[in-house]
From Swiss-Prot:
This is Sugar fermentation stimulation protein homolog. Belongs to the SfsA family. InterPro entries: SfsA (IPR005224), SfsA_C (IPR040452), SfsA_N (IPR041465). It comes from Edwardsiella ictaluri (strain 93-146). NCBIfam families: sfsA (TIGR00230). GO terms for molecular function: DNA binding. It holds the Pfam family SfsA_N.
């Protein structure tokens, strides 16, 4: 995935109200960015880090610039815009770069399904195989080289795991896809210390046949690309 317009850099002053961040541009001007990531963002929003942002010419936007990436003072690259994760996974599957789910001829996004009125991120279909339901999760919480998900208690994420279990029980494929968007993460675990119920449901889902995939990414201001599979412990 290439950014459609060149990103600009600034220094992070603070993130606040979940959706906003103040940054200082190289010319000294302070501007406010929109932050699409509503999670805890632990370790991803340290004042003094370099942030990279995109800008929109849409006059209806109150905050025309969006926080896309962080380059930490430790040298790690992080994709802050969680909306990018679905695009990255879609692109990689469409280009047949994810071997575990290759061979499907149709990809649909945001399809309603399940008993709890959910929308699946990606639905893969082909005439010669069962449908494949894929739920995408962005992983950015780094602790001792390990990535953890979730970074906060997520009832929505718990619901998604229940829905995926039901899909497997109905006879189709279901996949939980961890897109690791932090260059310092080398493997992923369920964050039992943050959301024990989510970790319990993930282990249960895996035992029932929900597939868990995990891929790292190459991240820089030009673009982001899913690259290699990473180990994941449920």
């Amino acid at each position: 995935m290439q950014f459609t317009t060149p990103l600009q850099s600034a220094i992070l002053i603070k993130r606040y109200k979940r959706f906003l961040a103040d940054v200082r541009r190289p010319d000294g001007q302070i501007i406010t960015l929109h932050c699409a990531n509503t999670g805890a963002m632990t370790g991803c929003a340290t004042p003094g880090d370099t942030v990279w942002y995109s800008s929109s010419d849409n006059p209806k936007r109150k905050y025309p610039s969006s926080w896309e990436l962080t380059h930490t003072q430790a040298g790690d690259w992080i994709c802050i815009n969680t909306l990018r994760a679905n695009t990255l996974v879609y692109e990689a599957i469409a280009q047949q770069r994810i071997g575990e789910v290759s061979g499907y001829t149709k990809i649909r996004s945001e399809v309603r399904y399940g008993a709890e009125n959910s929308r699946i991120d990606l639905l893969l279909q082909a005439e010669d195989r069962p449908d494949c339901y894929i739920e995408v999760k962005s992983v950015t919480l780094l602790q001792s080289a390990c990535g953890y998900f979730p970074d906060a208690v997520t009832e929505r994420g718990q619901k998604h795991l229940r829905e995926l279990q039901h899909q497997v029980q109905s006879g189709v494929r279901a996949v939980l896809f961890f897109a690791v968007l932090h260059s310092g993460i080398t493997h992923v675990r369920a964050a039992r210390h943050i959301d024990p119920r989510y970790a319990q449901l993930l282990a249960q889902a895996s035992d029932l046949g929900v597939e868990v995939l995990c891929y790292g990414a190459q991240i820089n201001p030009a673009g982001i690309r899913l690259t290699q599979p990473l180990p994941v412990t449920v």
